[in-house]
């Protein structure tokens, strides 16, 4: 969206992506076959790539819980999870969970073979049944494994990629979006970044940097009421406690709210914030007294703002990367990409 001249605030990282967080990797498995009414996939995020399981400190929040993110009971109790995050469609959660579990057993082979260990992967979803035959159960365990094995630390493809392939945002083509910010706190530079699977909102709500874009572009709307969701993953290399990470996750509501969404009743608006700092062994192998760094909450506001800015921009990036796609249910309509020329002109005037 920055390429269109949209003046987003803040300083992005070199990739303006969640992979600006050092070491974090993202992969996709994108499934498209119009003859089979297939437009779906899997997005994989690996906060700590490698073959040794380590705790990833995290916090979770649901603005509106009409959706699923597995593993969050333990995140809420223990403040961490282990392994990757995957995002897919609503009916693909079970298959992806099976695939991620198999991948973890194989990747962390020594851990699973030599200890009483269990996998509780984080798998989240949004509904792609307008552009994809979701009841055909196209997503299978091997697609999750393929996305995980494709993960890299480079640029992140946006729009109709991975789990975002069949998603609609504010009745424009939506999907995967990402953005990042660099901030300085206490003389240290940190990265805060987001990845979203944007499938939420109705056209009249869409607001971009304060402009009522949805009301100015009402053509080809698809819905009479909101029926989508958004998954937000926020990542940072700042050392944060699990409590602070939950507070960061809550700020995702502000990020999507800037885009116009009130968090509709039928929307699963579910957020996870994680930190790659405080690298260490699994708790059962750690000493009784843990020593971790933790950013003082009195200095955290800049990080909150960076998270809000990253999420706001990620949603717009998902929309701007869209293309026209034929609907499956109901058939015969077209989910339009946003008119980038009109969007560019709007901000040139403003």
Model-predicted regions and their roles:
Residues 1-350:
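Alpha/propeptide regions of enzymes that mature by internal proteolysis
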């Amino acid at each position: 969206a920055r390429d269109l001249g949209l003046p987003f605030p803040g300083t992005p990282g070199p990739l303006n992506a969640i992979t600006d967080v050092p070491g974090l990797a993202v992969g996709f498995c994108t499934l498209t076959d119009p003859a089979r009414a297939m437009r779906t996939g899997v997005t994989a995020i690996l906060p700590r790539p490698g073959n040794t399981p380590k705790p990833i400190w995290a916090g979770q929040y649901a603005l509106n819980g009409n959706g699923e993110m597995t593993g969050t009971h333990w995140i809420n109790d223990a403040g961490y999870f282990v392994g990757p995050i995957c995002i897919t469609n609503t009916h693909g959660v079970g298959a992806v969970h099976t695939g991620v579990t198999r991948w973890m057993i194989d990747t962390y082979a020594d851990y699973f073979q030599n200890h009483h260990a269990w996998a509780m992967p984080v798998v989240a979803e949004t509904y792609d049944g307008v552009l994809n035959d979701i009841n055909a159960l196209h997503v299978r365990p091997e697609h999750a494994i393929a996305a995980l094995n494709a993960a890299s630390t480079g640029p992140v493809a946006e729009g109709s990629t991975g789990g975002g392939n069949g998603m609609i945002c504010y009745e424009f083509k939506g999907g995967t979006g990402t953005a990042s910010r660099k901030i300085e706190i206490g003389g240290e530079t940190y990265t805060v970044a987001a990845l979203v699977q944007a499938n939420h909102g109705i056209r009249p709500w869409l607001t971009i940097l304060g402009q009522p874009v949805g009301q100015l572009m009402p053509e080809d709307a698809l819905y009479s009421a909101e029926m989508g969701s958004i998954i937000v993953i926020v990542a940072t290399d700042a050392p944060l406690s699990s409590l602070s990470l939950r507070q960061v996750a809550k700020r995702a509501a502000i990020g999507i709210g800037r885009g116009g969404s009130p968090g509709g009743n039928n929307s699963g608006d579910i957020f996870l914030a994680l930190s790659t700092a405080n690298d260490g062994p699994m708790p059962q192998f750690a000493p009784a007294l843990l020593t971790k760094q933790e950013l003082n909450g009195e200095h955290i506001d800049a990080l909150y703002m960076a998270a809000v800015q990253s999420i706001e921009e990620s949603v717009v990036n998902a929309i701007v990367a869209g293309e026209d796609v034929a609907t499956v249910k109901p058939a015969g309509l077209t989910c339009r990409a946003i008119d980038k020329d009109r969007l560019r002109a709007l901000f040139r005037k403003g």
